[in-house]
Amino acid sequence: MPAEIPTGHRKAWFFMNTCRRINSEWLFFKQPLSETATTLSPTLPAQNDSRFHPVNLPHDWLIANSADHYENSEGWYQKTISSDILPFDASSDDDWLLYFEGVYMDCTIFVNGMQAGEWKYGYSSFEVRLTPFLKTGENTILVHVRYQSPNSRWYSGAGIYRSVWLKKVP
């Protein structure tokens, strides 16, 4: 079995497709939910925004503030993927997907400034199809995550709290 495949995920599609974990070198920015009127544009590059700082996944933005583990807030994660990692070819029949093992709580995924998908709640994995939004060269993924409490009886965390995989399906 290839080393890139997590031992806890013995699903057939991991063996039939090309998968690559993309947990490193994300950029992150958090703001209170009350400031949603000033949220980022899905086309805004985080590299030029001083509010962003580098993080690796998995990431929980609530855990750093032990005084307020139920802070209503939203986070923005951005990753630019080079053509070395995602060699998109428009003439190919290959399909590209992002597989999220877990994002808490509600999230929307943008690819190159266009909404590619969304997922509500956070205790299940999901996939987002990238192919219709990809371009040759670098591609930018932006994940907007909203956390609003109360939503559970225990600490649930907030953010992309599990691995993210880039998946190529022939």
Each model region followed by its residue ranges:
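Accessory beta-strand-rich segments of carbohydrate-active enzymes
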Residues: 8, 12, 18-20, 27-33, ...
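Predominantly extracellular/luminal regions of secreted and cell-surface proteins
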Residues: 25-56
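A generic, residue-level signal for flexible/boundary positions that often mark functional hotspots
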Residues: 49-51, 64, 75
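Surface-exposed, low-complexity/disordered Ser/Thr/Gly/Pro/Asn-rich loops and linkers
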Residues: 55, 63-69
